[in-house]
């Protein structure tokens, strides 16, 4: 995941903030054209900060799971340890 492919937006219904992808994916028709341009923006900084904060908050749990060689590390961390992967409250990506 490239953080600078996302920007922070407000959900028009719930007013909650969420990260929305604005960059095309490799399989999209416009991808080759899009890659010809360089975009620099600080718009991804809130996502980077959010990810770093999650990692810092759950650092001990992350190391514990890695040490145990958990088979489904991502699922366990997301669902069991942090409870961050509940039902989505934001709009799906286009």
Swiss-Prot record:
InterPro entries: CNPY, DUF3456. It holds the Pfam family DUF3456. Belongs to the canopy family. It comes from Mus musculus (Mouse). It comes from the Eukaryota. This is Protein canopy homolog 1.
């Amino acid at each position: 995941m490239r953080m600078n492919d996302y920007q922070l937006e407000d959900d028009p219904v719930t007013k909650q903030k969420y990260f929305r992808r604005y960059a095309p994916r490799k399989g999209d028709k416009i991808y080759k054209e899009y890659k010809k341009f360089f975009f620099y923006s600080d718009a991804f900084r809130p996502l980077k900060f959010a990810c770093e904060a999650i990692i810092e908050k759950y650092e001990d749990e992350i190391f514990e799971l890695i040490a145990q060689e958990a088979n489904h590390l991502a699922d366990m961390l997301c669902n069991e340890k942090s409870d961050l992967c509940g039902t989505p409250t934001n709009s799906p990506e286009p």
